[in-house]
C-alpha cells in the first residue's frame, strides 16, 4: 500500500466497506416513545442474510452509505442512525422477512410528510442487495404527529357544517368523466343533488381541459348547489377539483371556490404531491372549506404485495398532511380491497387510538391524540344491491359514492339519486331496528322497492352485476 492510500489507524478512522449489520442491526435496542417505527417486507437477493438486508434498509434510509466516510466522526451516529431492531419471517414465504426499523425523531423536519417519505422510502427501494421491498406500516409518535395540522376540519365539524347526522353521506362522481361541457356538467350535478344525494364530485382527472375550463365548471356547479339546496332544504356540495400544475394555480382555484360560497374542494394528493396537499389543507382550514382527497396513482405504489408501500401508510400520511375525505376502496365493488385489511386502515383514518392487530394488517398501536379524523369514501363499481353491505362495513362516518350506480339509472340522474337515497334510508332504519344487514340485506332492499319505483327500476338493472375477483394484496396467514 502506498503512503498516499494507507489508512491512518491512529486517528480513529479505517477506510473501506463493512457489513451494515455491524452498525445498524441492533436486536438489543429498546424502542423509544419518540421513535418513528417502520415495518418493511424485505426480499433479499440470494445469499444476503436477513440481518444484513434489514440493517441495509435502516442504514440507507437514515445515516448510512456504501462505505465508511471521514465525516462519520463529526457527528453522533448512535444518536441519529436508524436501527433494525427486530426481524421475523413472513408466514408461507421462504425468502421474505418483516424487518422493523426505529428512526430517531431528530431525523425528520416537523410538519413535513414530504421530508418523512424522502428519508424513509426515498432511496432504499432501489438498493441492489434487495429483490423487493415494501413499507407495510409506520408508527407515528404523538411527538411528531402534533407538529402537523392534520385534516382541515374533521368528521364532527363536517357533520355540523352539513347538519347531517346518523347515516352515511351519499355522493356521485359525474360521468362521463371527460368530455362534457361545463353547463351540461352542472346540469348533471343539479339532477343528482335534487334527487337526494349530499355530494357530487369531479373525477380525479377533471382539472381544466379545453372542453371544460375550471372556472366555467366551478360557476355552473355552484349554481347546481344553490338551486338544489333551495328545492330540497338540505345543504349540498360538489367536490370542485382544485388540482393544478402549480401550487399557485391550485390556491387560485380554491380561492375562487371560496368566493362562490361552496362548502368543499378536492385535491389529487399523490399526483399533486404532499407539499401541495398540505398547503391546500392549511388554506382550507383557514377559510372554512372542507377538503376531499382522491388517491389517484395509489395502486402504482401499493397494489403489489412484495414491493412498494401499503395504502395504510399512505392513509396515515394523508391524515397528517390534511384531508377531510379520502377514497378507501369498497370491499364489494370493482376496485381492490380485502375486507379486514380495508377496515384496518379505515380505523386508522377515523379513530383516535388504534391497537396493533396483525389480523387486520396493523403492525403498530397508533395514538393520534387530538388529530381530527378523516371520512373514508367507498367508491368504484357499487350500486343499490351493495347498500346493505356498505352500510354494515363502513358505518355512519363514511361517504358512499355511486357514479355509474346513479347516472346509469334507466330513468335518469335524479331517479338514480332517489333510488340510492331510499336504499340507504331503508338500510339505516333496518340497522337501527336491530336487523342484520349482512344476512337480511337483499330482503330489506326488496321491501323498500315496494314503495319506491325508482329503487325497483335500479334493482332490476343491476341485479346480475358482480365483480368476483380475488384481491391481489392480502393479509399474511
UniProtKB/Swiss-Prot annotation:
The disulfide bond which can form between Cys-247 in the large chain dimeric partners within the hexadecamer appears to be associated with oxidative stress and protein turnover. The active site is at 175 (proton acceptor), 294 (proton acceptor). The modification N-acetylproline is found at residue 3. This is Ribulose bisphosphate carboxylase large chain. Binds 1 Mg(2+) ion per subunit. It catalyses: 2 (2R)-3-phosphoglycerate + 2 H(+) = D-ribulose 1,5-bisphosphate + CO2 + H2O; D-ribulose 1,5-bisphosphate + O2 = 2-phosphoglycolate + (2R)-3-phosphoglycerate + 2 H(+). PROSITE patterns: RUBISCO_LARGE. NCBIfam families: PRK04208.1. It comes from Triticum aestivum (Wheat). Belongs to the RuBisCO large chain family. Type I subfamily. One of its GO terms (biological process) is photorespiration. Keywords: Acetylation, Calvin cycle, Carbon dioxide fixation, Chloroplast, Disulfide bond, Lyase, Magnesium, Metal-binding, Monooxygenase, Oxidoreductase, Photorespiration, Photosynthesis, Plastid. Heterohexadecamer of 8 large chains and 8 small chains; disulfide-linked. The disulfide link is formed within the large subunit homodimers. It comes from the Eukaryota. RuBisCO catalyzes two reactions: the carboxylation of D-ribulose 1,5-bisphosphate, the primary event in carbon dioxide fixation, as well as the oxidative fragmentation of the pentose substrate in the photorespiration process. Both reactions occur simultaneously and in competition at the same active site. The record marks 14 as: Not N6-methylated. Mg(2+) binds at residues 201, 203-204.
Amino acid at each position: 500500500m502506498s503512503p498516499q492510500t494507507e489508512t491512518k489507524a491512529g486517528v480513529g478512522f479505517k477506510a473501506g466497506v463493512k457489513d451494515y449489520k455491524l452498525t445498524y442491526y441492533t436486536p438489543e435496542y429498546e424502542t423509544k416513545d419518540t421513535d418513528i417505527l417502520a415495518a418493511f417486507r424485505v426480499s433479499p437477493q440470494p445469499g444476503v442474510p436477513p440481518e444484513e438486508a434489514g440493517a441495509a434498509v435502516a442504514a440507507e434510509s437514515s445515516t448510512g452509505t456504501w462505505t465508511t466516510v471521514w465525516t462519520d466522526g463529526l457527528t453522533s451516529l448512535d444518536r441519529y442512525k436508524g436501527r433494525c431492531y427486530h426481524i421475523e419471517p413472513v408466514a408461507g414465504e421462504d425468502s421474505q422477512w418483516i424487518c422493523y426499523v426505529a428512526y430517531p425523531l431528530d431525523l425528520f423536519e416537523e410538519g413535513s410528510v414530504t421530508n418523512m417519505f424522502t428519508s424513509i422510502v426515498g432511496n432504499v427501494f432501489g438498493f441492489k442487495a434487495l429483490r423487493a421491498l415494501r413499507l407495510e406500516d409506520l408508527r407515528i409518535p404523538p411527538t411528531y404527529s402534533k407538529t402537523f395540522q392534520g385534516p382541515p376540519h374533521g368528521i364532527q365539524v363536517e357533520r355540523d357544517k352539513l347538519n347531517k347526522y346518523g347515516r352515511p353521506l351519499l355522493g356521485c362522481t359525474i360521468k362521463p368523466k371527460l368530455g362534457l361541457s361545463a353547463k351540461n356538467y352542472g346540469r348533471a350535478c343539479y339532477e343528482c343533488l335534487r334527487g337526494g344525494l349530499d355530494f357530487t364530485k369531479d373525477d380525479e382527472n377533471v382539472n381544466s381541459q379545453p372542453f371544460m375550463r375550471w372556472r366555467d365548471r366551478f360557476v355552473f356547479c355552484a349554481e347546481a348547489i344553490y338551486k338544489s339546496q333551495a328545492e330540497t332544504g338540505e345543504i349540498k356540495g360538489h367536490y370542485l377539483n382544485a388540482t393544478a400544475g402549480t401550487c399557485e394555480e391550485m390556491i387560485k382555484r380554491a380561492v375562487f371556490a371560496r368566493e362562490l360560497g361552496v362548502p368543499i374542494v378536492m385535491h389529487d394528493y399523490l399526483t399533486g404531491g404532499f407539499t401541495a396537499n398540505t398547503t391546500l389543507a392549511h388554506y382550507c382550514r383557514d377559510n372554512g372549506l372542507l377538503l376531499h382527497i382522491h388517491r389517484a396513482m395509489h395502486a402504482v405504489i401499493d397494489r403489489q404485495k412484495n414491493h412498494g408501500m401499503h395504502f395504510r401508510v399512505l392513509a396515515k400520511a394523508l391524515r397528517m398532511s390534511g384531508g377531510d375525505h379520502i377514497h378507501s376502496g369498497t370491499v364489494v365493488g370493482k376496485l381492490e380491497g380485502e375486507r379486514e385489511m380495508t377496515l384496518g386502515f379505515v380505523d386508522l383514518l377515523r379513530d383516535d387510538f388504534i391497537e396493533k392487530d396483525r389480523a387486520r394488517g396493523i403492525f403498530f398501536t397508533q395514538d393520534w391524540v387530538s388529530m381530527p379524523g378523516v371520512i373514508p369514501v367507498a367508491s368504484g363499481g357499487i350500486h343499490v344491491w351493495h347498500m346493505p353491505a356498505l352500510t354494515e362495513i363502513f358505518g355512519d362516518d363514511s361517504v358512499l359514492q355511486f357514479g355509474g350506480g346513479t347516472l346509469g339509472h334507466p330513468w335518469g340522474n335524479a331517479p338514480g339519486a332517489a333510488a340510492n337515497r331510499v336504499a340507504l334510508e331503508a338500510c339505516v332504519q333496518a340497522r337501527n331496528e336491530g336487523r342484520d344487514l349482512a344476512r337480511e340485506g337483499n330482503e330489506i332492499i326488496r321491501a323498500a322497492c315496494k314503495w319506491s319505483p325508482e329503487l325497483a327500476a335500479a334493482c332490476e338493472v343491476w341485479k346480475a352485476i358482480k365483480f368476483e375477483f380475488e384481491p391481489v394484496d392480502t393479509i399474511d396467514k
